């Protein structure tokens, strides 16, 4: 699969992450190991880990996706929103608000 094809599949996964089962964890972690520099793959990994509430593992790929200017705005926005949920889970309301502000600023 080409890089563009991987990005399309990864972004489709980000959009449909609600309710994904644990069987997806191994798949996205394998994709992350195989393509660690691809922002769309990081976005998908972070989204799946966040959906499973694996916040510690989700933080790094979500931060990478949120901050990558090559990634589509909607995927960056979703990453910032997931980071806001993570901050809320940790009781860091100031960080949660900052993440929501950054999510709103995405095009």
Annotate each PLM feature.
Residues 79-83:
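Small/polar glycine-rich anion-binding or flexible loop at a beta-alpha turn
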């Amino acid at each position: 699969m080409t890089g563009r094809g991987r990005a399309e599949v990864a972004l489709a996964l980000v959009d449909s992450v609600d309710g994904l089962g644990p069987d997806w964890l191994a798949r996205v972690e394998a994709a992350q190991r195989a393509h660690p520099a691809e922002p769309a793959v990081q976005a998908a990994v972070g989204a799946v880990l966040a959906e499973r509430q694996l916040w510690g593992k989700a933080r790094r790929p979500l931060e990478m996706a949120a901050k990558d200017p090559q990634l589509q705005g909607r995927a960056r926005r979703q990453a910032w929103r997931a980071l806001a949920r993570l901050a809320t889970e940790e009781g860091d309301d100031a960080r949660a608000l900052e993440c929501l502000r950054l999510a709103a600023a995405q095009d």
